[in-house]
Amino acid sequence: MWQLAAANMAAICVHTPLDIAEGAINTRLYDMLKGTLSLGEITGSPDGSGLGWTAESGEEFSAEELASILKETLGCPVVRFCKSDRPIRKIALCG
């Protein structure tokens, strides 16, 4: 940060209520993925303090399947993931 300030540059790191506001980043991610992943209702942290959401899928996915779906749906050239033998049903969103 000091180097940015010394060079008269600013940095914006937006991990704020913009993630959880109605119609904002998490909502857009959920809307893009809910049909493809058969997502149920979204839930936030129990005490309301977190910026992430979770949703249960009506289906199970392997890590490879989920990465492929995310890559295509979000238009990402690369999606990094860790292989696992456990099926994935709970999806976390944090814009």
Residue ranges and their predicted role:
Residues 1-95:
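Hydrophobic structural segments
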